[in-house]
Amino acid sequence: MFDVNTIPMSERVHITKNLLRYGIAIDQETGKIDYIPGTTIPEVRCESIYLIRHAETEAVSKHEFMCDTSNNCGFTESGIEITKKQAAELDEYNFDIALYGPIPRVVNTQLIIMERPQKFEAIKVHKLHGIDNTGWEYKSFEDLQHNPTFIAREIENNMFARTPSGTSWGMVIANCVDVLDLINEQYKGKRVLLISQGSVLRAFQILLRKRKHPWDDFTVEGMYHVGDDTNKKKNYGIIDKIY
Protein backbone atom coordinates (compact mmCIF):
# COMPACT_ATOMS: atom_id res chain seq x y z
CA MET A 1 0.00 0.00 0.00
CA PHE A 2 1.28 3.47 -0.89
CA ASP A 3 2.14 5.69 2.08
CA VAL A 4 1.28 9.35 1.40
CA ASN A 5 3.70 10.34 4.16
CA THR A 6 6.57 9.50 1.81
CA ILE A 7 5.62 12.66 -0.11
CA PRO A 8 6.88 15.92 1.47
CA MET A 9 4.27 17.78 3.50
CA SER A 10 4.99 21.00 1.57
CA GLU A 11 4.11 19.25 -1.71
CA ARG A 12 0.89 17.82 -0.31
CA VAL A 13 -0.12 21.22 1.11
CA HIS A 14 0.55 22.95 -2.22
CA ILE A 15 -1.55 20.41 -4.11
CA THR A 16 -4.36 20.58 -1.57
CA LYS A 17 -4.53 24.39 -1.56
CA ASN A 18 -4.47 24.77 -5.34
CA LEU A 19 -7.19 22.18 -5.91
CA LEU A 20 -9.31 23.70 -3.16
CA ARG A 21 -9.41 26.95 -5.15
CA TYR A 22 -11.39 25.04 -7.79
CA GLY A 23 -13.74 23.43 -5.28
CA ILE A 24 -11.90 20.11 -5.18
CA ALA A 25 -11.31 18.39 -1.83
CA ILE A 26 -8.56 15.81 -1.24
CA ASP A 27 -8.74 13.07 1.38
CA GLN A 28 -5.38 13.45 3.09
CA GLU A 29 -5.00 9.73 3.78
CA THR A 30 -6.17 8.17 0.52
CA GLY A 31 -5.40 11.04 -1.83
CA LYS A 32 -8.83 10.68 -3.45
CA ILE A 33 -10.58 13.79 -4.78
CA ASP A 34 -14.13 14.94 -5.36
CA TYR A 35 -15.96 18.16 -6.06
CA ILE A 36 -17.21 20.01 -2.99
CA PRO A 37 -21.01 20.36 -3.20
CA GLY A 38 -22.18 23.92 -3.78
CA THR A 39 -18.87 25.15 -5.20
CA THR A 40 -18.25 26.51 -8.69
CA ILE A 41 -15.11 27.12 -10.70
CA PRO A 42 -13.48 30.58 -10.67
CA GLU A 43 -13.99 32.82 -13.68
CA VAL A 44 -11.98 31.93 -16.77
CA ARG A 45 -11.25 35.20 -18.55
CA CYS A 46 -9.99 34.06 -21.94
CA GLU A 47 -12.37 33.44 -24.83
CA SER A 48 -11.40 29.81 -25.42
CA ILE A 49 -8.79 27.16 -24.61
CA TYR A 50 -7.81 24.26 -26.85
CA LEU A 51 -5.04 21.68 -26.40
CA ILE A 52 -2.98 19.69 -28.87
CA ARG A 53 -1.39 16.59 -27.38
CA HIS A 54 2.21 15.84 -28.36
CA ALA A 55 2.78 13.69 -31.43
CA GLU A 56 2.63 9.91 -31.09
CA THR A 57 5.90 8.48 -29.75
CA GLU A 58 7.74 5.20 -30.17
CA ALA A 59 6.79 4.41 -26.57
CA VAL A 60 3.11 4.60 -27.44
CA SER A 61 3.51 2.30 -30.44
CA LYS A 62 5.46 -0.19 -28.29
CA HIS A 63 3.09 0.08 -25.29
CA GLU A 64 5.94 1.28 -23.10
CA PHE A 65 6.06 3.92 -20.41
CA MET A 66 8.26 6.95 -20.97
CA CYS A 67 9.73 9.62 -18.75
CA ASP A 68 10.42 13.20 -19.82
CA THR A 69 13.75 12.33 -21.46
CA SER A 70 13.74 8.59 -22.23
CA ASN A 71 14.94 7.41 -25.63
CA ASN A 72 11.50 6.03 -26.55
CA CYS A 73 10.08 9.58 -26.77
CA GLY A 74 10.97 9.95 -30.45
CA PHE A 75 8.02 10.38 -32.79
CA THR A 76 6.62 7.77 -35.15
CA GLU A 77 6.28 8.70 -38.81
CA SER A 78 2.51 8.49 -38.44
CA GLY A 79 2.67 10.78 -35.41
CA ILE A 80 4.60 13.40 -37.34
CA GLU A 81 2.22 13.30 -40.31
CA ILE A 82 -0.89 13.59 -38.11
CA THR A 83 0.60 16.57 -36.28
CA LYS A 84 1.56 18.27 -39.55
CA LYS A 85 -1.98 17.80 -40.84
CA GLN A 86 -3.41 19.33 -37.67
CA ALA A 87 -0.95 22.23 -37.90
CA ALA A 88 -2.22 23.02 -41.40
CA GLU A 89 -5.77 23.39 -40.07
CA LEU A 90 -5.14 25.83 -37.21
CA ASP A 91 -5.94 29.02 -39.13
CA GLU A 92 -9.66 28.33 -38.77
CA TYR A 93 -9.39 28.63 -34.97
CA ASN A 94 -7.93 32.16 -35.03
CA PHE A 95 -5.69 31.57 -32.03
CA ASP A 96 -4.06 34.60 -30.45
CA ILE A 97 -1.35 32.73 -28.55
CA ALA A 98 0.07 29.23 -28.09
CA LEU A 99 1.56 28.06 -24.80
CA TYR A 100 3.65 24.89 -24.79
CA GLY A 101 5.22 22.70 -22.13
CA PRO A 102 8.94 22.28 -21.38
CA ILE A 103 9.69 18.61 -22.06
CA PRO A 104 11.39 17.53 -25.31
CA ARG A 105 8.47 15.69 -26.95
CA VAL A 106 6.21 18.69 -26.36
CA VAL A 107 8.84 21.20 -27.50
CA ASN A 108 9.38 19.12 -30.65
CA THR A 109 5.63 18.95 -31.30
CA GLN A 110 5.56 22.74 -31.06
CA LEU A 111 8.38 22.92 -33.60
CA ILE A 112 6.40 20.75 -36.04
CA ILE A 113 3.36 22.99 -35.60
CA MET A 114 5.34 26.22 -36.00
CA GLU A 115 7.22 24.94 -39.10
CA ARG A 116 4.10 25.97 -40.92
CA PRO A 117 3.67 29.77 -40.67
CA GLN A 118 1.04 30.44 -38.00
CA LYS A 119 -0.78 33.62 -37.02
CA PHE A 120 0.18 33.27 -33.37
CA GLU A 121 3.32 33.29 -31.24
CA ALA A 122 4.33 30.23 -29.21
CA ILE A 123 5.63 30.69 -25.64
CA LYS A 124 7.12 28.03 -23.37
CA VAL A 125 5.38 27.67 -19.99
CA HIS A 126 7.15 25.54 -17.39
CA LYS A 127 3.95 24.64 -15.51
CA LEU A 128 2.41 22.99 -18.61
CA HIS A 129 4.07 19.79 -17.45
CA GLY A 130 2.18 16.51 -17.24
CA ILE A 131 2.96 13.14 -15.71
CA ASP A 132 6.65 12.17 -15.58
CA ASN A 133 7.16 8.41 -15.24
CA THR A 134 10.83 8.54 -14.20
CA GLY A 135 11.66 5.12 -12.79
CA TRP A 136 9.14 3.34 -15.00
CA GLU A 137 10.57 4.19 -18.42
CA TYR A 138 10.55 1.31 -20.94
CA LYS A 139 8.29 -0.78 -18.68
CA SER A 140 4.91 -2.15 -19.78
CA PHE A 141 1.56 -2.18 -18.00
CA GLU A 142 2.16 -5.85 -17.22
CA ASP A 143 5.46 -4.93 -15.54
CA LEU A 144 3.75 -2.39 -13.28
CA GLN A 145 0.23 -3.66 -12.65
CA HIS A 146 1.15 -5.05 -9.21
CA ASN A 147 3.41 -2.14 -8.22
CA PRO A 148 1.89 -0.40 -5.13
CA THR A 149 2.76 3.10 -6.36
CA PHE A 150 1.31 2.40 -9.81
CA ILE A 151 -1.87 0.98 -8.28
CA ALA A 152 -2.20 4.04 -6.03
CA ARG A 153 -1.56 6.59 -8.78
CA GLU A 154 -3.39 5.07 -11.73
CA ILE A 155 -6.06 2.74 -10.32
CA GLU A 156 -6.91 4.24 -6.92
CA ASN A 157 -6.45 7.82 -8.22
CA ASN A 158 -4.33 8.89 -5.27
CA MET A 159 -3.36 12.51 -5.96
CA PHE A 160 -0.13 12.28 -3.99
CA ALA A 161 1.27 9.02 -5.39
CA ARG A 162 4.37 9.20 -7.57
CA THR A 163 7.70 7.54 -8.15
CA PRO A 164 10.59 9.04 -6.16
CA SER A 165 11.64 11.25 -9.08
CA GLY A 166 8.35 11.33 -10.99
CA THR A 167 5.17 13.38 -10.91
CA SER A 168 1.82 12.86 -9.20
CA TRP A 169 -1.58 13.58 -10.70
CA GLY A 170 -2.10 16.10 -7.91
CA MET A 171 0.94 18.12 -8.96
CA VAL A 172 -0.12 18.06 -12.61
CA ILE A 173 -3.55 19.43 -11.67
CA ALA A 174 -2.05 21.98 -9.24
CA ASN A 175 0.28 23.20 -12.00
CA CYS A 176 -2.70 23.67 -14.31
CA VAL A 177 -4.30 25.93 -11.69
CA ASP A 178 -1.19 28.11 -12.02
CA VAL A 179 -1.50 28.03 -15.82
CA LEU A 180 -5.11 29.20 -15.56
CA ASP A 181 -3.89 32.06 -13.34
CA LEU A 182 -1.39 32.99 -16.06
CA ILE A 183 -4.08 32.86 -18.75
CA ASN A 184 -6.42 35.04 -16.68
CA GLU A 185 -3.67 37.58 -16.00
CA GLN A 186 -2.15 37.85 -19.47
CA TYR A 187 -4.64 36.55 -22.04
CA LYS A 188 -8.03 37.95 -21.09
CA GLY A 189 -10.44 37.66 -24.02
CA LYS A 190 -7.88 35.73 -26.10
CA ARG A 191 -8.13 32.42 -27.93
CA VAL A 192 -5.49 30.21 -26.33
CA LEU A 193 -3.86 27.06 -27.73
CA LEU A 194 -1.98 24.75 -25.36
CA ILE A 195 0.55 22.17 -26.59
CA SER A 196 1.22 19.56 -23.94
CA GLN A 197 0.49 16.02 -22.71
CA GLY A 198 -2.62 13.88 -22.28
CA SER A 199 -2.40 14.17 -18.50
CA VAL A 200 -2.54 17.96 -18.81
CA LEU A 201 -5.68 17.65 -20.93
CA ARG A 202 -7.27 15.48 -18.23
CA ALA A 203 -6.16 17.92 -15.51
CA PHE A 204 -7.88 20.86 -17.22
CA GLN A 205 -11.01 18.77 -17.74
CA ILE A 206 -11.03 17.97 -14.01
CA LEU A 207 -10.55 21.60 -12.98
CA LEU A 208 -13.23 22.88 -15.37
CA ARG A 209 -15.68 20.09 -14.45
CA LYS A 210 -16.22 18.46 -17.80
CA ARG A 211 -17.56 15.37 -16.01
CA LYS A 212 -19.83 14.79 -13.00
CA HIS A 213 -16.96 13.18 -11.10
CA PRO A 214 -13.26 13.96 -11.72
CA TRP A 215 -12.38 10.41 -12.80
CA ASP A 216 -15.52 9.45 -14.71
CA ASP A 217 -14.63 7.39 -17.82
CA PHE A 218 -10.93 7.23 -16.86
CA THR A 219 -9.30 3.82 -17.14
CA VAL A 220 -5.63 3.02 -16.87
CA GLU A 221 -6.04 0.69 -19.86
CA GLY A 222 -7.33 3.57 -21.95
CA MET A 223 -4.77 6.08 -20.74
CA TYR A 224 -1.83 3.83 -21.51
CA HIS A 225 -3.26 1.90 -24.52
CA VAL A 226 -3.12 -1.51 -22.88
CA GLY A 227 -3.69 -4.47 -25.18
CA ASP A 228 -4.50 -4.37 -28.88
CA ASP A 229 -5.37 -0.78 -29.73
CA THR A 230 -5.00 -1.12 -33.49
CA ASN A 231 -8.51 0.11 -34.14
CA LYS A 232 -8.68 2.55 -31.26
CA LYS A 233 -8.83 6.24 -32.08
CA LYS A 234 -5.84 8.04 -30.54
CA ASN A 235 -5.62 11.78 -30.01
CA TYR A 236 -1.88 12.33 -30.34
CA GLY A 237 -1.22 15.46 -32.37
CA ILE A 238 -4.97 16.19 -32.42
CA ILE A 239 -6.76 19.26 -31.07
CA ASP A 240 -9.31 19.08 -28.23
CA LYS A 241 -11.47 21.87 -26.83
CA ILE A 242 -11.04 22.51 -23.11
CA TYR A 243 -13.02 25.72 -22.62
Where are these regions (language model features)?
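Phosphate-handling substructures
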Residues: 59, 70-74, 115-175
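Active-site catalytic microenvironments for nucleophilic, acid-base chemistry
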Residues: 89, 112-116, 182, 186, ...
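Short beta-strand scaffold positions
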Residues: 100-101, 174, 195-196
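Acidic, low-complexity terminal tails and accessory targeting/binding regions
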Residues: 1-47, 131-143, 185-190, 205-243
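Active-site metal-binding loops of divalent metal-dependent hydrolases
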Residues: 55, 198-199
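Generic beta-sheet signal
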Residues: 49, 190-198
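General small-molecule cofactor/ligand-binding pocket signal
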Residues: 50, 123-126, 240
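Active-site-proximal alpha-helix that buttresses catalytic centers in soluble enzyme cores
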Residues: 2-118, 167
